[in-house]
Each structure stands twice: as structure tokens, then as C-alpha cells.
Amino acid sequence: MNRQESINSFNSDETSSLSDVESQQPQQYIPSESGSKSNMAPNQLKLTRTETVKSLQDMGVSSKAPVPDVNAPQSSKNKIFPEEYTLETPTGLVPVATLHSIGRTSTAISRTRTRQIDGASSPSSNEDALESDNNEKGKEGDSSGANDEAPDLDPEIEFVTFVTGDPENPHNWPAWIRWSYTVLLSILVICVAYGSACISGGLGTVEKKYHVGMEAAILSVSLMVIGFSLGPLIWSPVSDLYGRRVAYFVSMGLYVIFNIPCALAPNLGSLLACRFLCGVWSSSGLCLVGGSIADMFPSETRGKAIAFFAFAPYVGPVVGPLVNGFISVSTGRMDLIFWVNMAFAGVMWIISSAIPETYAPVILKRKAARLRKETGNPKIMTEQEAQGVSMGEMMRACLLRPLYFSVTEPVLVATCFYVCLIYSLLYAFFFAFPVIFGELYGYKDNLVGLMFIPIVIGALWALATTFYCENKYLQIVKQRKPTPEDRLLGAKIGAPFAAIALWILGATAYKHIIWVGPASAGLAFGFGMVLIYYSLNNYIIDCYVQYASSALATKVFLRSAGGAAFPLFTIQMYHKLNLHWGSWLLAFISTAMIALPFAFSYWGKGLRHKLSKKDYSIDSIE
């Protein structure tokens, strides 16, 4: 084969006439000054060297495709080159033909895509659409005759990767920059979570302005939390297609704008509608920041960084009544609460928009577009571009699969229920404390807000403890292959503290007992809730590693639903059951849930194999 007869110059024994020595030495692509011209004739294409079979094998690429990273695009399935977003190669280009030579073949989804382009039909069942993955080769839909006869991806396609030491790869950014971005993004989560509970420190101002009861005023909190559960349906696809930075810029910009009608709302209906939309817009901070942090750290070291993300959504709501109780008492103005919230959101909007793009698929997509322009080769692309992205795939990844998991995965549902309980209890505290410290002790909103400080202190204590848990996990990784159950140490430590906090709260809610008694319950609860969330979040990821985003979406929906529901009956519960039994009822439930992390630690693997329709966990990875 003559070099000038081929668009891509990949080297292999089957396709190259170069010498064996030359064919095993990949050459780095160097753009020319004329590379900016995109309308090149075929004989004017700038040829580039790409990876060979040997160079890929030397980097550990084998015939068996690994499970995609948790941050890989969810709209594409059965990738033949899932390491594209994490692997660095000397040339930055990997031909499909070379992958075929190694033993990687096009998958059912890519063949289906080709048939659709060619105009052929490709019917499949809903179950196949939801469950098709690398471990289901022998199932219906993956081994059909139609699939075997379908053509593979064009062998002249060249997949783009990061080059060795690529400064565009977020993993290669200096450590201080990555940790700085981690802290800033965690503050973004605190900002969003703060916004959900900001009005809880001044519900009396809502009652006074609109002449409504407390139950109606509480809806201004609940509806924003409900918005958190629906927003990911918008921002996850936007992030997959256009990147994290675009999603933050658009969503946080809308959030800032919609705080204006919240402050100026002429009636309660307008306020509630705008609060719901604020939840939808701002939810990008809750559903994408964990991914942004994971983008910047390899899987071996991202655990400690993710701990900051686990800390933020539980501390943010606590800051709401802490700050706005003083605004409510000193000014009595509801609108000022939203102006302060808008200012905080505006600052974080600017900061989040200034953080560079961290999502590897989008970075590589832009790099591929640049290389196509410089070389004139239209077949340089990412695997996501080669397979194509359809709205149907987006809907399956973002909506249908989470719903599917919620009815077919009992282990996931039980884990999500515990996360939902802890999150709901946090929002219950926002309305239990005003009853205990406001009605019993006679404190005003500003002093009631100060009672939330112990929760923050407990959460900070838990954040430090997550580093201990992470070090223990890394020790296990060095000794043997880890299991999802190894992630449960934090939950086993934190679960008793969350229950103890509620027992203390009920036992000390007497006027003759100094306020330190019930306030100290916040220390134990803050410590327990962060550890439980940190641990169970990692457990869900490891149990459903192949579809982690969908499993986490199920968690977000159930958690937000619980967080929205609990405030609606907390005050009535404390009034009907009294201050002691109101807390003890929740304490009984929390005490029963202590068994969950311990039970899963001992029997989790067996339960997953018996109760789950399929094993999605890291245990299934050879």
C-alpha cells in the first residue's frame, strides 16, 4: 500500500508495507502551518502516524475491552475502545483497524447504528435496550444473525486519545490546581444546597407577606427540592453533549435570574413556581459536580476528592437557617433573603464558568475537530461521534434506565432508601429545631439558626474521617481485589451516630435542660450523615459500575423526593406526638437502619447475585 493512497497511515502487519522496525515505532503528529486549511484534496492530506498493535499491547490494551470509566458517556453502549478517555498514547490516534487486529470488534450498538444509516431495520426489545452491555454477548439481541452479518465500523476511522503527558488531560494538571477546583466546585454545591433551605430561616416573613399558614410557606422549600430530582434529566444530556462548563454556565445563569422573581413575587403561587424552577436550574451543581471532580483525578486517587462532594450537599442546607435567621429577625424582609441568595449564586456562577472544561469526551471531541481541520482527514473522531448520539439513547440513559433499576434492583432501592432517610432527616431538623428551640426555649430565628452550628462541626469531623476510610480501602486494594462491600466502612461507623443523635434530641427536649443538650445532637447527626452518604454513594458506584450514572440518578430522585416530603409533616408530627416521641419515632427507624450496612457487608454479594437481575458490579470484571 502506498502512503499517499491511504487517508490514515496506521501500521500493522496486515495493512502496512513499511519495514517491521518502522511499523512498531509510532510517530507523534505535528501540525503544519498550513494545517488550518480544511478543504484539502485527497492527495494533499497531511498523513500522520498512529498507534500499532504492538504499541497498544505494550500499553496494556488487550482483546477484552474493560468496563468504561464511570464518567464515560452514558449515551453510547458496548464500546470497542472504552479506554479512549483515560488512556494516553504517544501519537494520540488509534485506528479502528488496529483495534480489530488486536481482537476488538464492533458491538451490537455500532452495528445497529450502521444498519440505521444504511436504511435497514433493527428491532429490539426494551429489555435488550436497557441491559445490553459487554457481558451479554450470549443474550438475545447481541448474538443474533442480523448482528453477525452487519458491517463493522469503518476501519479507516481513527479514534482520538490524549497524548502522553497531554496538558489538556485534567489528570495532568498540577495537583494544587485540581484541589483548588475541587474546593471551588464543592462550594458551588454548598451554594445550591444553601438556596434550597435559605428561606427556612425566615418562613415567618413568607407567612406575613402573603398571609398564609406555615404549611403553605414550607412549600417554598419542598418545591425547590423536588426541582432537584427533575433537573438532572436536562443537565446530564447537556453535559454529555456540550461539556460541564456549558451546563454550569447556562444552568447557574438561569438560577441567578430566577431568584429575581422569587424576591419580587406578588403572591405565593408565583413564589412557589419560581422556587421549583430554581431547583430545576440549579440542580446541575448537585448532579454534575461529582463528575467534574472525578474528571480531574484517576480512579485510584479520586476517593478523597469525592469526599468533599459528599460533604457539601449536607452542609449547604444547614447554612441557610444559620445565615437567614439573622436577616429575618433584623429586617423582617423576605426579599432580602433571596437577594443574598442571588448574590451568592452569582459569584459561584462566575467562578464555575471560569473553571476549564474537565469532561474528557468533550475535550477529545474538540481535539478531533481541530485535527480534522488541520489534516483534512474527516475520519478522525471520538468513538462517541463514530457511533452517533440519538435522543432515544439519551432518554434510556437519563430516564428509562434509572426507572428500570428502581423496580428491578432491590439492593439499590434499599441503599437509596437509607440515603433518602438521612437526607430527609436533615430537612426534618430545619423544622424540628424551630419547634424545640423556638416554642420550647423561646428563641428567635437568629438564635435558632445558631443551633445548626454543631451539625456543621460534626460534618467537618466526618470529612476528616473519610480520609481514614479511604486509606483503609486503598490498603485493601493493595492486598486483594476489592468488592463493593469494602466501601461500607464509613456507613458502619456513621450509622450508629445518626440514630444516637435522634435519641439524644428526644431525651433532652425539656425546658429545664440547658440548650446544649438538644443542640449536641447535631454533632452526632452531622458526623453520621456525611459518613453514611460518602460510603453508600461509593457503594452504589461499585455495585453498578457499568451504569453508575443511572444508579446515581435513581438515588438523586429518591433522595430529593424524601427531602421534599419530610418538611411537610415534621411540625405537625412534633405537635401531635410531643417533642420527645417525635424524635424517638425517627430514632426507632434510624436504629433499625443501622443493620443495613452491616448486613450488606456480610451478605451483600450473595444478595446482589440472588436479587439483582444482572451483576453490574466490579465483581463481574475479570
Swiss-Prot record:
<keyword id="KW-0812">Transmembrane</keyword>
<feature type="topological domain" description="Cytoplasmic">
    <location>
        <begin position="297"/>
        <end position="305"/>
    </location>
</feature>
<comment type="similarity">
    <text>Belongs to the major facilitator superfamily. DHA1 family. Polyamines/proton antiporter (TC 2.A.1.2.16) subfamily.</text>
</comment>
<keyword id="KW-0472">Membrane</keyword>
<feature type="transmembrane region" description="Helical">
    <location>
        <begin position="447"/>
        <end position="467"/>
    </location>
</feature>
<feature type="topological domain" description="Cytoplasmic">
    <location>
        <begin position="1"/>
        <end position="182"/>
    </location>
</feature>
<feature type="topological domain" description="Cytoplasmic">
    <location>
        <begin position="468"/>
        <end position="487"/>
    </location>
</feature>
<dbReference type="GO" id="GO:0000297">
    <property type="term" value="F:spermine transmembrane transporter activity"/>
</dbReference>
<dbReference type="InterPro" id="IPR036259">
    <property type="entry name" value="MFS_trans_sf"/>
</dbReference>
<feature type="region of interest" description="Disordered">
    <location>
        <begin position="1"/>
        <end position="76"/>
    </location>
</feature>
<feature type="topological domain" description="Extracellular">
    <location>
        <begin position="267"/>
        <end position="275"/>
    </location>
</feature>
<feature type="transmembrane region" description="Helical">
    <location>
        <begin position="488"/>
        <end position="508"/>
    </location>
</feature>
<feature type="topological domain" description="Extracellular">
    <location>
        <begin position="438"/>
        <end position="446"/>
    </location>
</feature>
<dbReference type="GO" id="GO:0000329">
    <property type="term" value="C:fungal-type vacuole membrane"/>
</dbReference>
<dbReference type="InterPro" id="IPR020846">
    <property type="entry name" value="MFS_dom"/>
</dbReference>
<feature type="topological domain" description="Cytoplasmic">
    <location>
        <begin position="237"/>
        <end position="245"/>
    </location>
</feature>
<feature type="transmembrane region" description="Helical">
    <location>
        <begin position="183"/>
        <end position="203"/>
    </location>
</feature>
<protein>
    <recommendedName>
        <fullName>Polyamine transporter 3</fullName>
    </recommendedName>
</protein>
<comment type="function">
    <text>Cell membrane polyamine/proton antiporter, involved in the detoxification of excess polyamines in the cytoplasm. Recognizes spermine, but not spermidine.</text>
</comment>
<feature type="modified residue" description="Phosphoserine">
    <location>
        <position position="101"/>
    </location>
</feature>
<dbReference type="GO" id="GO:0005886">
    <property type="term" value="C:plasma membrane"/>
</dbReference>
<keyword id="KW-0813">Transport</keyword>
<dbReference type="GO" id="GO:0071944">
    <property type="term" value="C:cell periphery"/>
</dbReference>
<feature type="transmembrane region" description="Helical">
    <location>
        <begin position="276"/>
        <end position="296"/>
    </location>
</feature>
<keyword id="KW-1003">Cell membrane</keyword>
<feature type="transmembrane region" description="Helical">
    <location>
        <begin position="584"/>
        <end position="604"/>
    </location>
</feature>
<feature type="transmembrane region" description="Helical">
    <location>
        <begin position="216"/>
        <end position="236"/>
    </location>
</feature>
<feature type="modified residue" description="Phosphoserine">
    <location>
        <position position="132"/>
    </location>
</feature>
<keyword id="KW-0050">Antiport</keyword>
<feature type="compositionally biased region" description="Polar residues">
    <location>
        <begin position="1"/>
        <end position="47"/>
    </location>
</feature>
<feature type="region of interest" description="Disordered">
    <location>
        <begin position="105"/>
        <end position="152"/>
    </location>
</feature>
<dbReference type="GO" id="GO:0055085">
    <property type="term" value="P:transmembrane transport"/>
</dbReference>
<dbReference type="GO" id="GO:0000296">
    <property type="term" value="P:spermine transport"/>
</dbReference>
<dbReference type="Pfam" id="PF07690">
    <property type="entry name" value="MFS_1"/>
</dbReference>
<feature type="transmembrane region" description="Helical">
    <location>
        <begin position="513"/>
        <end position="533"/>
    </location>
</feature>
<feature type="topological domain" description="Extracellular">
    <location>
        <begin position="204"/>
        <end position="215"/>
    </location>
</feature>
<feature type="topological domain" description="Cytoplasmic">
    <location>
        <begin position="534"/>
        <end position="550"/>
    </location>
</feature>
<feature type="transmembrane region" description="Helical">
    <location>
        <begin position="417"/>
        <end position="437"/>
    </location>
</feature>
<feature type="transmembrane region" description="Helical">
    <location>
        <begin position="246"/>
        <end position="266"/>
    </location>
</feature>
<keyword id="KW-1133">Transmembrane helix</keyword>
<dbReference type="GO" id="GO:0015297">
    <property type="term" value="F:antiporter activity"/>
</dbReference>
<feature type="modified residue" description="Phosphoserine">
    <location>
        <position position="55"/>
    </location>
</feature>
